[in-house]
Amino acid sequence: MSYDYEKTSLTLYRAVFKANYDGDVGRYLHPDKELAEAAEVAPLLHPTFDSPNTPGVPARAPDIVAGRDGLYAPDTGGTSVFDRAGVLRRADGDFVIPDGTDIPPDLKVKQDSYNKRLQATHYTIMPAKPMYREVLMGQLDNFVRNAIRRQWEKARGL
């Protein structure tokens, strides 16, 4: 049995703000093979599902909202990435999704628009079909693993 996954056609970058995560995510900025095979990965590609209620932090809308049936549908939002590193200057770094990375079959990467101010094109990683939150998070975690694996392969000329 063969699986031919759609692959990313260009390198994409996800801004990482270390304060948004419970653990140390710094190692994801320069991952290794061991991290690609880890049982658990940091939720680097998870969108904001709920508006944060943190005192002193301006409220912002969720990146994706579930329908009445509890499912997250295609073209209703998702995870923001850009085609250029360092777009968000306040970020601690960027998680790299190299060109040629396998896109999990239940996700899609949609090109949105060019942002003149940021001088970068915005893309959204979103569900390719309706799915529950836990399934979406699992698919996004698999995308992280695939990106780490592809980084490792590219570093070795594979």
From Swiss-Prot:
Q: Which InterPro entries match?
A: ADPRTs_Tse2
What's the impact of mutating residue 14 to A? Complete loss of toxicity
Alphabetized, the UniProt keywords read: Secreted
Q: Which GO terms describe its cellular component?
A: extracellular region
What is known to happen upon mutating residue 122 to A?
Complete loss of toxicity
Question: What highest taxon heads this organism's lineage?
Answer: Bacteria
Protein name, as recorded: Toxin Tse2
User: What is the source species?
Assistant: Pseudomonas aeruginosa (strain ATCC 15692 / DSM 22644 / CIP 104116 / JCM 14847 / LMG 12228 / 1C / PRS 101 / PAO1)
What does the record give as the organism's lineage?
A: Bacteria, Pseudomonadati, Pseudomonadota, Gammaproteobacteria, Pseudomonadales
